[in-house]
Amino acid sequence: MSQDFVEIAKIGATYKLNGELNLYPLANSIETLLSYGDWYIQLPATNVWQQLKGESVLKRADKVYIKLANINNADTAKKYVNALIGVPKRALPQLAEDEVYFKDLIGCSVKNINNDSFGVVVDIIETGANEVLVCKEDNSEYLIPYVKQYIVSEDLNSKKIVVDWEYDY
């Protein structure tokens, strides 16, 4: 398949003897995860996405479990542990002009208005109040609040972000 996929969940350990698996959403909420139509799976150590044939998805409190079709015991289910679940990028909702998918920020180079480099975005921390870009340059790590006040410009096609931020903040 030549289309781009976005990871929305990761499969964890087996849950029951009948082959159910723990499912860890990478989306903001379990409801968001469950709202996507067709899911695809990428087994560990492969770059191949295959359409996922799920039998059922069970939500209990804040946990999610998945039962894959034709997987009827824990031994068979173990080969799916640490597999990724994805959806085609085209399946994601269209964003407003001032919105971005956080995954698109990963790998962006970050410089300030003085052209000082903060390296590249390697992670995003969700604090509740706002998100924070985790940028790495050589052996240094910089935490930059991802708020309009500090983001001067973003060019996601060129993977570049300009911030109004200094090393000593």
Swiss-Prot record:
SUPFAM superfamilies: PRC-barrel domain, Translation proteins. It is found in: Cytoplasm. GO terms for molecular function: ribosome binding. Keywords: Chaperone, Cytoplasm, Ribosome biogenesis, rRNA processing. The keyword Chaperone applies. Residues 97-169 form the PRC barrel domain. The keyword rRNA processing applies. One of its GO terms (cellular component) is cytoplasm. PANTHER family: RIBOSOME MATURATION FACTOR RIMM (PTHR33692:SF1). An accessory protein needed during the final step in the assembly of 30S ribosomal subunit, possibly for assembly of the head region. Essential for efficient processing of 16S rRNA. May be needed both before and after RbfA during the maturation of 16S rRNA. It has affinity for free ribosomal 30S subunits but not for 70S ribosomes. Binds ribosomal protein uS19. The PRC barrel domain binds ribosomal protein uS19. This is Ribosome maturation factor RimM.
